[in-house]
Design a protein with these regions (language model features):
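Cyclic nucleotide-binding regulatory module and flanking cytosolic helices
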Residues: 1-27, 82
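Alpha-helical bundle regulatory/interaction domains
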Residues: 19, 93, 108, 118-135, ...
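Short beta-strand segments in beta-sandwich/barrel cores
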Residues: 27, 54-59, 76, 100-101
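Glycine- and acidic-residue-biased ligand/ion/polar-headgroup-sensing regions
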Residues: 34, 45-56, 73-74
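Short phosphate-coordinating micro-motif centered on Lys-Gly-acidic
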Residues: 37-42
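Cyclic-nucleotide recognition modules
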Residues: 66-125
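Phosphate-/nucleic-acid-contacting segments
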Residues: 144, 151-191
């Protein structure tokens, strides 16, 4: 669990007693490729810190999968709207490859916030980062061409995700067809 501790210590120094509180509520879980952790209509019960692997959040629009978020090693992921509201999700959370996570249940997370204000600050910081990510994505969709969105994705997610995400899923994230993505990639000789 040192990856998680290192991640958290970037923002707030976690002492031993705080770390012990957090460790007590973490579940280590492993999932196979293409396994759904949350389905549309289901209430999201966990937030996940990814130890290794790759996941995506997506929704269905007229039967077509639209990817809205990718996360890999060293990042948090959930279907956040459902997690926060504790109402049924409109999204799916799926592994793209075999994945190991540290899972924290929503109920235990709220209890932890009440026990220790430092964890509530961490939660607020993560929520703020999530909001900024969504805001930037919305702005990019409104102001950038498909090529510009692709370049933004490369600059934001780096090679550690781009080489692992199937082209069809990446294309849906960018709001384009897979064939268009193939042409754009060809212009930059990135495969």
């Amino acid at each position: 669990m040192e990856e998680l501790r290192t991640y958290l210590n970037q923002y707030f120094k976690i002492n031993e007693s705080e770390w012990n509180l957090l460790q007590a509520i973490i579940q280590n879980q492993k999932f196979d490729t293409k396994q759904l952790l949350v389905q549309s209509g289901q209430v999201s019960k966990y937030i996940y810190f990814i130890r290794s692997g790759l996941l995506r959040v997506f929704h269905l629009n007229k039967g077509k999968e639209i990817s809205t978020y990718f996360a890999c090693d060293g990042q948090f992921i959930s279907t956040f709207e459902s997690l926060i509201t504790q109402k049924p999700s409109t999204e799916y959370l799926e592994t793209i490859e075999a994945t190991e996570v540290y899972a924290i249940s929503y109920k235990k997370l709220i209890d932890l916030y009440e026990q220790n204000p430092k964890f509530e600050k961490i939660g607020r910081m993560l929520a703020e980062q999530n909001y900024l990510c969504i805001k930037n994505r919305t702005y990019n969709f409104q102001t950038q061409t498909a090529k510009e969105r692709y370049l933004e994705f490369i600059n934001t997610y780096h090679q550690k995700i781009i080489q692992r995400v199937p082209q069809k899923q990446l294309a849906s994230y960018l709001g384009i067809e897979a064939e268009s993505l193939s042409r754009i990639r060809g212009q930059f000789l990135i495969t």
